[in-house]
């Protein structure tokens, strides 16, 4: 995951699977929308995380108090997910849709920050799902203890059988870096959705 502070028009010329966007001081909203459009073209998960203290929209400058910058970004409703079909299918599973973040999980995410949570996801996936035949496959992901574990169960990324069933990722072969990035993108997408509720 990359967190990008936008203080001028820019192109996405870096490799990432998840982009969190924060408006810098005096950012023009059209710059945020342009970055979102680039994410859509590249199928990069995009989240508008914060407006910043002043946002320019249609030539007007809006001063936004610090305690409202996150909620105003959510209110813009410009987030993009390349995983909509997957989340629609997951919503029909009683088991998958029974997972949600508890207050302590939300607090943990807020304290650690999105980049750290993404690092944890990559570490867990590499260690627990990366090998062709993971140790204790089917039981390697705890049901609690970390927000990423909850997200794995909610998204069918908890074991190699579920990866095959929900994501058509073949079993009994090492996961490629691209597959691991995709899995982490799905996990982060679920966490973003939960934190927005």
Predicted regions and their residues:
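Glycine-rich active-site/cofactor-binding loop and its immediate structural neighborhood
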Residues: 160, 167-174
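Auxiliary Fe-S-binding modules of radical SAM enzymes
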Residues: 6-16, 20-79
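Core of compact, soluble alpha-helical bundle domains
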Residues: 80-125
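Short Fe-S-cluster ligation motifs
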Residues: 182-197
């Amino acid at each position: 995951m990359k967190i990008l502070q936008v203080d001028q028009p820019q192109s996405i010329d870096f490799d990432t699977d998840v982009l969190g966007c924060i408006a810098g001081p005096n950012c023009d909203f059209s710059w945020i929308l342009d970055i979102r459009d680039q994410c859509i073209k590249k199928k990069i998960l995009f989240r508008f995380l914060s407006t910043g203290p002043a946002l320019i929209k249609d030539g007007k400058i809006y001063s936004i108090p610090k305690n409202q910058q996150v909620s105003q970004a959510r209110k813009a409703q410009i987030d993009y997910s390349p995983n909509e079909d997957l989340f629609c299918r997951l919503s029909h599973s009683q088991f998958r849709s029974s997972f949600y973040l508890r207050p302590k999980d939300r607090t943990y995410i807020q304290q650690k920050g999105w980049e750290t949570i993404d690092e944890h996801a990559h570490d867990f996936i590499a260690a627990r799902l990366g090998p062709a035949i993971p140790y204790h496959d089917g039981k390697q992901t705890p049901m609690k203890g970390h927000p990423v574990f909850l997200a794995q169960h909610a998204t069918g990324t908890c074991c190699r059988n579920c990866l095959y069933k929900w994501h058509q990722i073949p079993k009994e072969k090492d996961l490629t870096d691209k597959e691991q990035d995709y899995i982490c993108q799905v996990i982060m997408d679920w966490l973003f959705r939960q934190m927005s509720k």
